[in-house]
Amino acid sequence: MAINRVYTRDFWTDVSSVNRIVWVKPVVIPYIDTDDELAAILSHSIAHGVDSYEGILRGYISILNYWVAPNKYDLKADKTAVDYMVNADYNPLALITILNKIGKQYRYDVFSNHTLVSRRMMLIYEYIYTKYPNVLVDNDYKDNIYYQNFLLTSRKNRMKLLEKIQTNSKNKIRYSY
């Protein structure tokens, strides 16, 4: 699939699910410090576009799924974005750092249908840890303040992941925030 162009757009949501156009919010651009972080944003948006394009009427109907249950599709797009980044030789940890910079944490929002950013970052970390462990060994982000913040605030969750791996458990981990 070819992407026609990348635009910036002032709009309340990212729309990359129809017409093969990737939109990037202008408010995000000042937070991008590296090519890896730009690749993270684009990979996530492209993953949404690719996922929705395979639907009825070329994806026009599947956009309703995103509005009804965005949580499921964001988590799938996060994993696909990691795969895209690794295949394109970008550091997938940038997805964690950019989410740490721009992600809003709706901790007490009972009506939110989005996964908490802290949980999303941990699920991305778990996916990288299990599928691409060599990325974590000696990475360029080890001194990055946003990655360090993630490591500091996710210590208990990373211990849960370590316990799951050591016990060979197949159970899903309920990460705290």
Q: Residues of each region from the PLM?
A:
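C-terminal capping/extension segments of zinc metalloprotease domains
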Residues: 1-4, 30, 75, 79-177
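Catalytic zinc-binding patch centered on the HExxH motif and its immediate surroundings
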Residues: 1-20
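Active-site-proximal beta-strand/loop segments in catalytic clefts of secreted hydrolases
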Residues: 4-7, 26-27, 43-45, 98-99
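Envelope-exposed proteins and targeting segments
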Residues: 18-20, 36-39
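Short, aliphatic-rich beta-strand segments
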Residues: 20-26
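Catalytic Zn2+-binding segment of zinc metalloproteases
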Residues: 28-37, 45-61, 88-90
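Active-site His/Glu-centered metal-binding helix of metallohydrolases
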Residues: 42-51, 76, 80
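Substrate-binding clefts and substrate-entry loops adjacent to catalytic sites
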Residues: 52-72, 101-105
